[in-house]
Swiss-Prot record:
SUPFAM superfamilies: ClpP/crotonase. It is an enzyme of class 3 (hydrolase). HAMAP family: ClpP. The keyword Cytoplasm applies. This is ATP-dependent Clp protease proteolytic subunit 1. InterPro entries: ClpP (IPR001907), ClpP/crotonase-like_dom_sf (IPR029045), ClpP/TepA (IPR023562), ClpP_Ser_AS (IPR018215). The active site is at 96 (nucleophile), 121. One of its GO terms (cellular component) is endopeptidase Clp complex. It is found in: Cytoplasm.
Length: 195
């Protein structure tokens, strides 16, 4: 069930689902597995927020176990395409494609809450069919692995061979370890108080 928020304005009341209300504050929430439906929604939100104000930052909160590489790359490419800076924040878990999208935020604006976990690994896939079909699928997975590792290398400052070795198996990090690794820039302990 999606929570609803009641907002009073000018003597009238409006009801929003919580995600629509957050979007009005330029906040996108990825709180599920990355699928085509998730990707379409997030891409649309990014494009909408850019059209609304191309000079105002966007905030993306991520609590995701990962998901489809193709759909995640669609989100990633859109994040790089839109003009606004994108703050990414891990809340809970950013694993696999979730971690990749966390690292895709604007450098200097990638963060995590302190008890979150972050995990990178190589793409997963299965193959069936005739030997030639299995070979085609294996080549595609190797291509995707190379693309993801190249992007992670560029975003973290780690050399490609280190990324390749670290993503060979599940590689878990605490937020402070993710800062050291270059996946994020900051561990958020407390929300700053505005005076």
């Amino acid at each position: 069930m999606i929570p609803l928020v009641l907002e009073e304005s000018g003597g009238s009341e409006r009801v929003f689902d919580i995600y629509s209300r957050l979007l009005r504050e330029r906040i996108i929430f990825l709180g599920e597995q990355v699928t085509s439906e998730t990707a379409n929604r997030i891409v649309a939100q990014l494009l909408f927020l850019e059209a609304e104000d191309p000079d105002k930052d966007i905030y993306m909160y991520i609590n995701s176990p990962g998901g489809s590489v193709y759909d995640g790359l669609g989100i990633f490419d859109t994040m790089q395409h839109v003009k606004p800076d994108i703050h990414t924040v891990c809340v809970g878990l950013a694993a696999s494609m979730g971690a990749f999208l966390l690292a895709a935020g604007t450098k200097g604006k990638r963060s995590s809450l302190r008890h979150s976990r972050i995990m990178i690994h190589q793409p997963l896939g299965g193959a069936r069919g005739q030997a030639s079909d299995i070979r085609i699928q294996a080549d595609e997975i190797l291509f995707l692995k190379e693309r993801l590792n190249t992007e992670l290398s560029e975003r973290t400052g780690k050399d490609y061979e280190t990324i390749k070795e670290d993503t060979d198996r599940d590689f878990y990090m605490s937020p402070s370890e993710a800062v050291e690794y270059g996946l994020i820039d900051l561990v958020l302990d407390k929300k700053p108080v505005k005076v």
